Amino acid sequence: MLETPAAIRIDVDSARDVALLPELLDLLLLLDVKATFFVTTGPDRLALNLFKYITNPRSSIRFIKSKPLRYGSHSLNGLLRKTQVETACPEVLLRILKEGHEIGLHGYDHYAWIRNLRSMDETRIKELISNGLEALKAVTGADIRGFASPGFTVTNAFLRAIDALGFDYSSDFKSNKPMSPFYPQTETKGDSVLQVPVSMDSIGELFIAGYSDSQIKAKMCKNMDVWHAKRVPFVIYAHPAHEVGCYMELFSSVLRDLREDSRFIPLTLAQIAQKWKVRV
């Protein structure tokens, strides 16, 4: 039986995410699974991100369901104290590499990126990405070849920027239906950076949407069946502050099910991109 590629994408958006990485790495070591970690660089403005929900009555229910207390004292980052995400704990980022996982870049200044990307031109976006690459390399020494836009925020200017900077692949799209890796089209030409989409909402997002544990497990199983039938790479993603900090038991169960399913072969996103380029 032909195996379907499967990947675990971990988004590190804040210092709180960094603080929970050791627990996540222990789990991955136990399961013998390699993951791709997309690390945000620049200032941690978590307090501003939470504040926008408090000041918007329409978002209050979503805010409560998101379990804001999961961030603990890190909720003050960006308001009462300054913290750089990539320097919050350099040792744990080095451990990611030491244990054979992949590190990619998740933008620079996560809060400002999501808030302002749509108004940025290509030059400004390239400047921010270059700042991020420099910051992450200074801590890890890694040659960063993969990218993931915070909030799955995409513009034509952004696509041109990652193309110009020569990334091997990027993961900037999410679809609840099978979507093969693809090369997007800008208004002027086809992009040369392969996109590897995420396959479904995270566990945390599904909880906020009202799903129960059993419904999330059922949705995961159904999606695995559909993606395998289509032979499309199955990519799940998580945030340590959510899946590790709040839903560790369910998250562990989901990863174990995926690891033990003989229909799937665990790969990093870089490995999926490499294999797909050979295929096409």
Task: State each model region's role.
Residues 196-208:
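Positively charged, amphipathic and often flexible ligand-engagement surfaces
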Residues 1-146, 151-194, 214-236, 243-280:
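Catalytic alpha-helical scaffold of carbohydrate-active enzymes acting on polysaccharides/glycoconjugates
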